[in-house]
Amino acid sequence: MKIVEVKHPLVKHKLGLMRENDISTKRFRELASEVGSLLTYEATADLETETVTIDGWNGPVEIEQIKGKKITVVPILRAGLGMMEGVLEHVPSARISVVGIYRNEETLEPVPYFQKLVSNIDERMALVVDPMLATGGSMIATIDLLKNAGCHSIKVLVLVAAPEGIAALEKAHPDVELYTASIDKGLNEHGYIIPGLGDAGDKIFGTK
């Protein structure tokens, strides 16, 4: 599995600000979107382009345009919505597929409860976004769902990832690509990433 820890100074700086315990909902939400945008820039660096001719101000001009598979952005509800706008800044014409999966706090197992995928998803590249890759259960369940629907070109974008989640994802889906702003130390006894970001969903939506 291709694993990319994005080490750009802007990514590290913005992620560091997100780790502040008393950060406001507004600021956390803004930074989640901004880091999501920067991760998208990295994740789409290998997209193929083609030369096309358009009408320029002084006659025909050749330009480069992205070719190949169309894109669907797949936020995992609910926290993934906090990264979605940042992703769409770079791929504004992408279709949006939504997957709802929550983690049972006692068993740590993923529980699917909603899905709405775009048509012709088998012809698209999926950018799956979720702030945290902890145990990997929710991400694996989401990718299972996408593959069952025919989508096999999948890239995962997360703000922070635990080594345990990375190992689980690689074992289940070695063909996906992972882009993260940080590979953190690991999980605590409750399955939360350390140092992590706390509950990203609560911080994005202002709930407890």
Curated annotation (Swiss-Prot):
CC cofactor: Mg(2+)
Cofactor details (free text): Binds 1 Mg(2+) ion per subunit. The magnesium is bound as Mg-PRPP.
Assigned protein family: Belongs to the UPRTase family.
GO biological processes: UMP salvage; uracil salvage
Organism: Citrobacter koseri (strain ATCC BAA-895 / CDC 4225-83 / SGSC4696)
Activity regulation (record text): Allosterically activated by GTP.
PANTHER family recorded: ADENINE PHOSPHORIBOSYLTRANSFERASE, URACIL PHOSPHORIBOSYLTRANSFERASE, CHLOROPLASTIC
GO molecular function: GTP binding; magnesium ion binding; uracil phosphoribosyltransferase activity
Keywords of the record: Allosteric enzyme, Glycosyltransferase, GTP-binding, Magnesium, Nucleotide-binding, Transferase
Signal peptide interval: none
Enzyme Commission number(s) from the entry: 2.4.2.9
Recorded catalytic activity of this chain's protein: UMP + diphosphate = 5-phospho-alpha-D-ribose 1-diphosphate + uracil
HAMAP family with a match to the protein in the record: Upp_B
Protein name: Uracil phosphoribosyltransferase
Residues that coordinate or bind uracil: I193, G198, D199, A200
Binding site for 5-phospho-alpha-D-ribose 1-diphosphate: R78, R103, D130, P131, M132, L133, A134, T135, G136, G137, S138, D199
Function: Catalyzes the conversion of uracil and 5-phospho-alpha-D-ribose 1-diphosphate (PRPP) to UMP and diphosphate.
Pathway: Pyrimidine metabolism; UMP biosynthesis via salvage pathway; UMP from uracil: step 1/1
Oxidoreductase is among the record's keywords: no
